[in-house]
Amino acid sequence: MTATATRHDWTLQEARELFNLPFNDLLFRAQSIHREHFDPNEVQVSTLLSIKTGACPEDCKYCPQSGHYNTGLEKEKLLEIEKVVAEARVAREKGASRFCMGAAWRSPSKKDMPYVLDMVRQVKSLGLETCMTLGMLKEEEAKELADAGLDYYNHNLDTSEKYYNHIITTRTYQDRLDTLDNVRKAGMKVCCGGIMGMGEDEDDRVGLLVQLANLPQHPESVPVNMLVKVKGTPLEDVEDLDPFDFIRIIAVARIMMPASHVRLSAGREQMNEQMQALCFMAGANSIFYGEKLLTTSNPEADADMQLFRKLGIRPEQREQCATEEQEEEAIAEAVEYEATRHMFYDATRESA
């Protein structure tokens, strides 16, 4: 079997051996495989919006939205559909090809589902790919989302099965795998990855990748997050992750899942340009673009554009901002619009 063949039978030992290759050898191998499947100078750009923030009943130790921890985050109601569509338009003008919507729920409620489905339809009508992360899904809920036109569903495994109970106790690893199975059955694409730097060891990091790569079908999108430590969460004082270990994980993900988009997700604000460039060299080819990821900071849009220009990178499917002048105009509009994020449902109902 060749090194670049799509496999679903990876062992932990094989993943360890990849991770521990000399750094230059690992990046060379990852970049070579990357070039067989993707344009090395093209990056898929997504924008992420929190459509319902805070008071989540889950106890994920990394998350400021958990109702179990005092992080100072105020609970907000489900955003108006009009507000979501307006944000999606701005994202499209900034060059995003995919618009992702996240809600701090254990799973979507029946009363909120019609609003969520309408969000999908209206964002889809703008010509954007759509992605949602709403917690666990039953088969019928997944089918409803697929019928509404949802392209991707995000549901991360977060870490290895071995380390999982150190991070989350309110839902099981199997619960997460069942949701992924329901998403696949409904015909949607899967966005699934994890978080590095939560106190896990090397085997947990590569173990997560083994779990992902041995799914019946590789996730189309694999977000690799670097922990953003938030005051008030149990992980606020965890030891920092070595940047080279993070880059190694990106490279191993690329080798093990050669045709998946590997996304630099949360934690990019803590990465300098050189680290991000090495991640792109290691095979990352997707980012979240915009000033915020749900509730945590992200590099400013103009900083991302400057980095892209330095590296000669172009966004996938970028049609709305063909010139530098249009890019700068769209960014200015987005920054101005950011100051008006106050339109929430006035209804007395609140989503838990």
UniProtKB/Swiss-Prot annotation:
Membrane spanning stretches: none
Cofactor(s) the record lists: [4Fe-4S] cluster; [2Fe-2S] cluster
InterPro entries, alphabetized: Aldolase_TIM (IPR013785), BATS_dom (IPR010722), Biotin_synth/BioAB (IPR002684), Biotin_synthase (IPR024177), Elp3/MiaA/NifB-like_rSAM (IPR006638), rSAM (IPR007197)
Pfam families, per database record: BATS, Radical_SAM
Pathway(s) where this gene product acts: Cofactor biosynthesis; biotin biosynthesis; biotin from 7,8-diaminononanoate: step 2/2
Residues noted as binding [4Fe-4S] cluster in the record, renumbered to the chain: 56, 60, 63
Keyword Repressor among UniProt keywords: no
Gene Ontology process terms (BP): biotin biosynthetic process
Superkingdom of origin organism: Bacteria
Cofactor note: Binds 1 [4Fe-4S] cluster. The cluster is coordinated with 3 cysteines and an exchangeable S-adenosyl-L-methionine. Binds 1 [2Fe-2S] cluster. The cluster is coordinated with 3 cysteines and 1 arginine.
Entry keyword set: 2Fe-2S, 4Fe-4S, Biotin biosynthesis, Iron, Iron-sulfur, Metal-binding, S-adenosyl-L-methionine, Transferase
Gene Ontology MF term list: 2 iron, 2 sulfur cluster binding; 4 iron, 4 sulfur cluster binding; biotin synthase activity; iron ion binding
EC number per UniProt: 2.8.1.6
Record: residues binding [2Fe-2S] cluster: 100, 131, 191, 263
Catalytic activity: (4R,5S)-dethiobiotin + (sulfur carrier)-SH + 2 reduced [2Fe-2S]-[ferredoxin] + 2 S-adenosyl-L-methionine = (sulfur carrier)-H + biotin + 2 5'-deoxyadenosine + 2 L-methionine + 2 oxidized [2Fe-2S]-[ferredoxin]
UniProt-listed Gene3D superfamilies: Aldolase class I
Self-association state and partner proteins as the record states: Homodimer.
General function of this protein: Catalyzes the conversion of dethiobiotin (DTB) to biotin by the insertion of a sulfur atom into dethiobiotin via a radical-based mechanism.
Family: Belongs to the radical SAM superfamily. Biotin synthase family.
Name of this chain's protein: Biotin synthase
Organism lineage string: Bacteria, Pseudomonadati, Pseudomonadota, Gammaproteobacteria, Pseudomonadales
